[in-house]
Amino acid sequence: MVQPTGIHHIAIMTGDMKKQIEFFSDVLGAPLVAIFDMHGVPGGIHAFLKLDGGCYFSLVQLPETAETPITLGLTHAGTGAGNSAPGTMQHLAFYVADENRLIAMRDRIRTKGVNVIGPLNHGMCKSIYFAGPEQITLEVACPGM
């Protein structure tokens, strides 16, 4: 049976493409590798930032996105324990190979002035949590057992 072998990219809506690219490039070290007009979407912009392991983090901005309100508990969870509507993203977790890299990411993120919680040991993984621009709840995790 053929099935996917992983995630190529996840696309997050943004009202401020420049701010998001700067955050993920500077804070997480993910370089911008492509930015282009969205095919068949007038005024739409699609950007790709590369992560280790052959996957990408993607940002999408449409002309009306900046005017769409962020509503915690509906459009965004706001925290790792927060609620949001069915079909929305509760949080985005990035992967690192081990606890040493997790601690290095925590320290790097903190040097950028971002508050980081953790690491927390969940048994199957260890994680740190922090907030990105536009109320995105972010996590970096490594194997725990």
What label would you give each PLM region?
Residues H8-H9, H46, F57-S58, H91, ...:
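Histidine-centered active-site/metal-ligand motif
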Residues M13-E64:
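Core segments of cupin and vicinal oxygen chelate
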